[in-house]
């Protein structure tokens, strides 16, 4: 006999089902059955269809949950502001990498090789998603702002560049299997690849300049 679900408000019920479904989707991809998900959630299979309408809608909602940066924003806001700039940024990149790894794992399991389309999203959903992403970037930029005088670019631009680097350096295929650690990403972003000599003027603010000199101002005597 299928278990009878404890009565919950609709949004709480959906959230509980998604919490049970995400690990199964990461492991089995679309091969997972609604019966497996129902058993993991401790509910009757029909409850899934009452909550989401279809398995496809459930999978899409799971992807939307994985892409939701709410937990990322909260984690960034908890980073210790008393840490030095480099250490503070390493923690932020580690948090970002942890989220990216979960997203990549889900997308690989679902055999999705490009950014997913959320067919069931409303314009309000899309606006909220953009707003949340903007808030995540702002939370990261706020971590850098106390030391903005050490940066050659505004914190928002540094976050954008670090974000691009973190994505490509964390993705197992984009990185060619050479995934970088948070420390390596931050050291590259802040200090680049070129040794810095006394009196060296800052490079132009482009991709090459960022790669060679990083985002941080270099004082005399930097090596």
Put a short name on every predicted segment:
Residues 25, 59-66:
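Alpha-helical DNA-contacting segments of helix-turn-helix folds
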Residues 42-52:
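Short hydrophobic/aromatic patch on the recognition helix
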Residues 1-40, 57:
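Basic, helix-initiating cap at the start of DNA-binding domains
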Residues 64-95, 101-102:
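Amphipathic alpha-helical linker/stalk segments
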Residues 19, 86-105, 183-187, 191:
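Amphipathic alpha-helical segments that line or abut small-molecule/effector binding pockets
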Residues 1-12, 71, 76, 119, ...:
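N-terminal intrinsically disordered/low-complexity leader segments
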Residues 98-102, 137, 142-146, 153, ...:
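Amphipathic C-terminal alpha-helical segment
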Residues 87, 99-109, 116-149, 155-160, ...:
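Amphipathic alpha-helical packing segments from all-alpha helical-bundle domains
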